[in-house]
């Protein structure tokens, strides 16, 4: 699975959506020129939905996004009918415009994020109305016949202040022992903070997962957290919930703590 942006960079509101045909053509061409030859089984993309505004330049984001996505997906799937396409959709800009989103090409799986309070938030505190978040998840789950997925957060994230795109091919995970140890200690402090709230609020992750169908694509962001060195406790808890959410939360937490590789910050 490979990922790239369709029609935007880092500022949705600065995106020009006046020519959706051109945007769709460019997105399809980028796949054809840069990714098709790599023989991946699928692609993940985001477009101009990561904002709390409903419009860009007077155009409704939900309507424009669906039009552009369907055009680009059709062009790609015409040549690559077996390709899996995942659409990373931010609910913040389309929350009240689901009548448009239901028209996304059924061959495209929508991976929803920013759908309310935790587990859709970066910090695993319970801020907001969980019952409303649960109800919205139920609504989008049944919105359309195409693939459905959720993206949970509340774990480590990229430091966007220092982030840079890789300029080319590179070897993953090759650092000195000192570099790894220093990074581990840096991230341990962050994981300790997250871990405290997972201990209190993992039950809400369980409640969301319990209402999802077995066919749901359930994903989570674990970014820049030295995950390749340690399986941090929140990740272990999340994994146990996915494995079988139909258990008492205390049982799930205990099983996660007993995982040999699980690490407490």
Predicted regions and their residues:
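Catalytic-core regions of glycoside hydrolase
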Residues: 1-264
């Amino acid at each position: 699975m490979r990922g790239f942006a369709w029609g935007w960079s880092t500022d949705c509101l600065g995106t020009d959506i006046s020519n959706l045909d051109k945007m769709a053509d460019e997105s399809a061409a980028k796949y054809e020129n840069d990714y098709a030859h790599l023989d991946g089984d699928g692609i993940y993309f985001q477009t101009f939905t990561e904002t709390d505004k409903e419009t860009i330049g007077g155009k409704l984001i939900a309507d424009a996004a669906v039009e552009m996505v369907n055009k680009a997906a059709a062009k790609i799937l015409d040549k690559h009918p077996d390709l899996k396409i995942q659409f990373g959709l931010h609910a913040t800009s389309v929350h009240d415009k689901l009548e448009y989103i239901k028209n996304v090409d059924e061959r495209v799986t929508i991976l929803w994020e920013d759908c309310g309070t935790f587990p859709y938030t970066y910090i695993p505190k319970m801020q907001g109305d969980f019952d409303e978040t649960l109800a919205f998840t139920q609504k989008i789950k049944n919105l359309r016949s195409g693939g459905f997925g959720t993206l949970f957060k509340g774990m480590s994230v990229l430091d966007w202040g220092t982030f840079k795109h890789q300029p080319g091919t590179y070897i993953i995970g090759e650092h000195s022992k000192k570099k790894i140890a220093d990074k581990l200690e840096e991230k341990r402090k962050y994981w300790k903070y997250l871990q405290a709230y997972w201990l209190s609020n993992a039950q809400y992750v369980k409640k969301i997962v319990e209402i999802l169908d077995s066919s749901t694509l359930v994903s989570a962001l674990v970014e820049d957290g030295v995950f390749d060195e340690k399986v941090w406790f929140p990740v272990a808890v999340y994994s146990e919930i996915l494995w079988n959410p139909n258990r008492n939360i205390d049982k799930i937490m205990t099983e996660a703590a007993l995982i040999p590789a699980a690490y407490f910050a």
